[in-house]
Amino acid sequence: MKKIYWVSRHAPLLSQINELKRIFKEDVELIIDPEPFSSAKEIAERYKRSGCSDLVVVAPLSVLQKLVEEEGLHPLYAVMIETKEGAEVEVKGKYYRFSCFKRVKGVKLELEDIQPP
């Protein structure tokens, strides 16, 4: 059985659990951690202590970037499509349906200073 550490304040959807089973071709045990985190380093430490072999993280892009670049982790990312049709979840008046998981290999943030008009 594949053990996966799930870092999100949102519980996994049935469609997400089924997709993980399909991807890994075995049953999965999710260790769900809904607790807030202060940094990518804290997520990495909690994941390593969990004994899990994979990781799903719902976090800001800057945190995902640090997980990859500073902690050497490549978490799974749940792709959600904003749509009312077939929606599985509603958050603050917006509707979403799970699409697939992708592995985070890198995150590139391009930022520029804001110039006054």
Where do the PLM segments sit?
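Active-site-adjacent beta-strand anchor residues
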Residues: V57
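Short beta->alpha connector loops
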Residues: P60-S62
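Long, low-complexity, Lys/Arg-enriched
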Residues: M1-D54, Q65-P117
